[in-house]
Design a protein with these regions (language model features):
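Active-site-adjacent structural elements that line small-molecule/cofactor binding pockets in enzymes
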Residues: 1-333
Length: 333
């Protein structure tokens, strides 16, 4: 019997095909086809150069020289989509937490969870070197992003969990006796899924409900899960079910050569921009090939996928969503 997993689709909030219309149509089509979630990601500043080479929605072939590097903000976009959908989960992977005021973002996210009827999936992370300009612009020291993230996330947990009054005293966030409502629809809170590798594993173990890495092999997944569980055990934390995500490039076609041809340039460009990544850590191929790759990840412990489809136009995305839904999705239900 095939193990179960949830599947979500990254919608084009960035990249050459980013637009209000494309974000909404992709979300509603994914819901219609039975996908479990849609996902957005988060940046404050985003340059034309980044928009041309670091493409995680669309494809490099779709890039138009000189076009504005539109990047739709995560929380407001999910709030808009909450009002345009019925049941599909609304995920962000990940909020770059050091760039946000922890009290304000906690309030916004609680509100979003209530308005959506408990559909929020909350990914949090520190931000990578690629987004250093955002830290400079906002006035946050990039080298301190890890400890800021831990502090801010702890502060947010105090707001989510404590009632009627919340208090927290940390290095970067302090408040006492504050009443912040409404509290989240989901109890005790939306699932907190920590992005990243290395030190992020400790953050996921101690402050999160899950972990979502990217560009990682099944063996890397198994190793990361083992490390998280080891940290929890040493801290005396009763092991609870762990959400294990995988943010992964995807390209599917009945003809595997077409799927690979569709994806190769974008995967190569993205790998060059971050210094790692290859087809080995993607879901590229025919439905049967993609299903086998998914099985290997599920066997390693993944129970939730954020699919970053590669597509030159919206017709290509719709086609791939249909193929995935009909030939792959149902096998993991």
């Amino acid at each position: 019997m095939t193990a179960k997993a949830e599947f979500g689709v990254r919608v084009p909030v960035s990249g050459p095909l980013a637009s209000k219309e494309n974000i909404l149509s992709t979300t509603q089509f994914a819901e219609k086809l039975g996908f479990d979630a849609i996902w957005v990601h988060d940046q404050i500043t985003w340059s034309r150069e980044q928009n041309s080479h670091h493409v995680s929605s669309g494809s490099v072939e779709a890039v138009v020289e000189g076009a504005n590097p539109d990047f739709y903000e995560a929380v407001t976009t999910l709030s808009y989509l909450a009002g345009q959908t019925h049941s599909i989960k609304l995920g962000v992977a990940v909020i770059v937490l050091p760039l946000r005021n922890p009290v304000v973002i906690a309030k916004q996210l609680m509100n979003l969870d209530v308005l959506s009827g408990g559909r929020l999936l909350l990914g949090v992370g520190t931000g990578a070197p690629l987004v250093g300009k955002s830290f400079e612009t906002v006035g946050v020291p990039f080298e301190s992003r890890g400890e800021i993230t831990d502090d801010y996330l702890s502060a947010m947990l105090a707001i989510f969990d404590q009632s009627p009054k919340s208090e927290y005293s940390g290095k970067y966030a302090k408040f006492s006796g504050v009443e912040i409502f409404p509290k989240p629809f989901q109890k005790p809170r939306p699932p907190i899924i920590v992005g990243g590798l290395g030190r992020a594993l400790r953050r996921a173990a101690l402050l999160g409900d899950g972990w979502i890495p990217a560009n990682i092999t099944p063996a890397g997944i198994s190793e990361g899960i083992g490390r998280i569980m080891e940290i929890r055990k040493k801290k005396g934390i009763t092991t609870k079910e762990l959400i294990v995500g995988n943010e992964i490039f995807s390209s599917i076609d009945k003809d595997s050569s077409i799927a690979r041809g569709n994806a190769s340039a974008t995967i190569a460009s993205y790998a060059k921009s971050i210094g790692r990544g290859s087809e080995e850590v993607t879901l590229v191929g025919s439905p049967s090939e993609v299903s086998k790759k998914i099985e290997s990840y599920v066997g390693a412990g993944v129970n939730m996928f954020e699919l970053k489809f590669i597509y030159k136009d919206m017709a290509s995305l719709r086609f791939q969503l249909e193929v995935f839904a009909s030939d792959v999705l149902r096998s993991f239900r």
